[in-house]
Amino acid sequence: MDIKQYYDNKLARIGVQTARLKHRNRWFLTGEIGFFAALIGFLILYTLVPGGAWCLVCAAACFAIYGCIRLFDAKNSRRIEALGKLETVCRAERLAQDGDFSAFGDGAHHLHPQHSFALDLDLFGSQSLFQRLNRTVTTAGSNRLAHYLTTLPAQDARDDAWIEEQREAIDELSAKETWRSAFCALGNGSASPISSQQVSEALSAMEQISFPVIIRHRLLPIIAYASIGVFFILTACCLFTPLTATFPITWALLQFGFSFFLAVKTLRTTGQTIGHVLRETTVYVQLIRHITAATFVSPRTQQIQALLHDAPIAFKELESMLNAIDRRGNVLGMFFSNALFMSDLFLVCRVRSWLQRHRGRAIAWIEAVAEIEALVSMGAFRYQHPEARAAVVTSADSVCYQARGFYHPFLSPLKAVKNDFTIADGHFYVITGANMAGKSTFLRALGINYILAMNGLCVFADQLSVSVFSLFSSMRTGDDLTKGISYFNAELLRLRQLLSEAAKNRHTLIILDEILRGTNSLDKLNGSLLFLEEVARMPITGVIATHDIELSKLETTRPDRFHNYCFEIELGASDVYPYKITRGVAHNQNATFLLRRMLKESH
């Protein structure tokens, strides 16, 4: 069964289940109305019929049945809501199979134009690689996924062993489609991702809360329990002895005053600090429970699961405390709970105990969930593309890039033209070709497949073997009038950045598309030659696309370092664009030819 058919069938099953539950809801509603009406009827009948004790029994039975139906109705409604979220997730996955990724965040806010390659390789924005991958439900998860796409292993000491572990985790989660869909559905209840930063900041601020000295005394809970015991003893004495009600009432008021005024400041501060993230905390409870309940086998996922071992109980306790603080808004309930049970006092003790046991750990748990989100996103991408293959990542201390039958990931495998290409360390490959011949798409295919490989993801090639190195591209330089930067000046700044970053790394692959296009042809040629001669002295390997045929002469003067490749086209009554890269220099250019045809057609 193909993926489209799988999701079509799954959506159909969800629709049937939802319809059945909604039908059940109508019966529950009818039952609630019926038994509530019967309850009122029996109570009225009790006041009208002599010796109507049996009416009270029937009323009590109706009330009990009504309560049970309400519970079943609430549970049924939660199941309908959960199925609705799951349907949204599955529908988004089904649309993704047709090339519609609008349901997923595009990560445009992660894009920094000065990044080494993010802008040129379409990592962020509409129809970007990030949007095709993104299944995150929190902002921390989105940040982690963006970090992996923009930070290559060569930049933060990750090696080929780390990449292999990453691949194992991705493959494992790719096979868990049901688990992944349920995970995404848990965070699908709001229009925007859960704000991890708000939760982290609230938890950090919560750790700074100060508690009264008496709250920290270890005998306080014992004294509180003893006081509550005295109150109930006084109440019993009031009922069964001549003792007046003044004593238990006075004691209750004293308990209220002691509990309320001792805890009110701390609870108010706690509520103001973290109460506004109750919804986010509830979602984290559900996500962490889902993670810890799973059965994982890969080392990476098992490590994350072990880190979250205590988190479900801790977050559930935090959620319970926040709900208790929120319920204090009911003044009458707050008064009686403090007067009878000193609830505020025990709530403050719970907050303090929670902080003592989990101080500093909650932030690590949030990061662990973010890691799972990034892996879930990559696993979903792997599942959506069964045609892709695993790359071979070598430990070679040099630039190694050997691709056979590779193509751009955004293209349909049925329509994409596959190419073979090998990049050797320290060599430069000058690619010439006409407009629309496929040079830029080829360069982006090189870069994006490398990023996928460095993250343990499947690549779009029959075979791809790469080493770990740094990457820098210059393909989409633009002017910035707000800063007074012209197009040509922006190009110079980009090339300066290239030299600076390449000098910091052991091995760098540069991908350039038509450098120095902001000046005239002769100046552009001389400048390009000067620049390439300079970078040839550095630990740099390069692929350069250009329209300047003169640059191909570098192969003649430096055959040991420079190599010519081209995308040739066939011009005629029907233009042919093979999109195949071959050795040599392009001979056909199409700008003048196409312009002449356009002018001829306009007459």
Language-model features, listed with the residues they occupy:
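Alpha-helical coupling/stalk and coiled-coil linker elements that connect catalytic or binding modules
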Residues: M1-A434, F442-L471, L493
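ATPase nucleotide-binding head domains, primarily ABC-like/P-loop NTPase cores
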Residues: M378, H385-H603
